[in-house]
Amino acid sequence: MKPTLRRKLEALVERHEELERLLSDPKIVSDTDRFRTYSRELAQLAPIATTLAEETRTKADLAAAETLRTDPEMRELAEQEIAIAQAHLTTLDEELQRLLIPQDPRDECNLFLEVRAGTGGDEAAIFAGNLFRMYTRYAERQRWKVEVESDTPGEHGGYKEIIARIVGRGAYSRLKFESGTHRVQRVPATESQGRIHTSAATVAIIPEADEIADISINPADLKIDTFRSSGAGGQHVNKTESAIRITHLPTGVVVESQTERSQHANRDKAMKRLKAQLIESERSQQATAEAMTRKLQVGSGDRSQRIRTYNFPQGRITDHRVENLTLYDLPNIIEGDLDPLIDRLRQEHQAEELARLSNAP
């Protein structure tokens, strides 16, 4: 481990010890807000303190075993203990580095998934449908709930646009690296001469706004329109203008909701999406600026960035953000087996974060 990371660990352990002292202070105990804040921070630092203490004990065991190795009668046993201790130290070192990476506070959030057809006409809409189905299948494997907010079907299948809310533990942490342009190379069903066409679709993963991280929106900045829903709900939706369209005038962001029977419920849903969009837009601008400075590839979340190619004739999928990340398992991945990709992306992101921490003063 680099000395800079070791110093950060030691500082965090000192803070852990300080928090333990503070939480035994009667003045802190009687102050509910401070007690809660310090308790939360202590809980976050506890895994680092525990793992570092385990590392200290293992180093002591290693030193004792190395001393025993000088005794001919104990040498064989000592070498076994040395091998075990060294392997354990390697594991602990990796775990400590992982624990140093700041946790994204949005990781446990629900999210909005937006898939839109890009270049490629009907084939792009069909591909957008393939992507949405892929994410839906993955959500089913994770036992997450998928709620379609709005959709515009393509003329020959798929979707020109589909927006859904995904609800489940750790949903954003698993899918946050999916934002960007996805490209497909295959022979369309309508292609009579067997030529391979290239089409594209864009994916946006937007964390649902946490009430704690809520933002204030001036009602004067909103233009609210009502219209008749074309979605589910039977005859009722055709009789009343229950659907809502909200335009945020300063930014031009437009959101709609038409899946609920009442105008009030659709308005609430649309406002949730609007808040999420505005928060994510601000975060994305900050992340893009950081990415330009740090040359960060995985975590920027830029929707215009071409991130992945799905080559159907070769059964190949390539993620362009990670060197040599090509998998020849497209049939399973497109059916929702995304973990091999997601795990590699998360590992790459962790490596980038560790590099940043190592170079920080």
Swiss-Prot record:
Entry-linked InterPro entries: PCRF, Pep_chain_release_fac_I, Pep_chain_release_fac_I_sf, Prokaryotic/Mito_RF, RF-1
GO molecular function: translation release factor activity, codon specific
Protein name listed in UniProt: Peptide chain release factor 1
Superkingdom, natural source: Bacteria
Stretch forming the signal peptide: none
Organism, scientific name: Xylella fastidiosa (strain 9a5c)
Disordered as annotated region, ranges: 284-306
Residue positions, PTM N5-methylglutamine: 235
Keywords: Cytoplasm, Methylation, Protein biosynthesis
Function: Peptide chain release factor 1 directs the termination of translation in response to the peptide chain termination codons UAG and UAA.
NCBIfam families: prfA, PRK00591.1
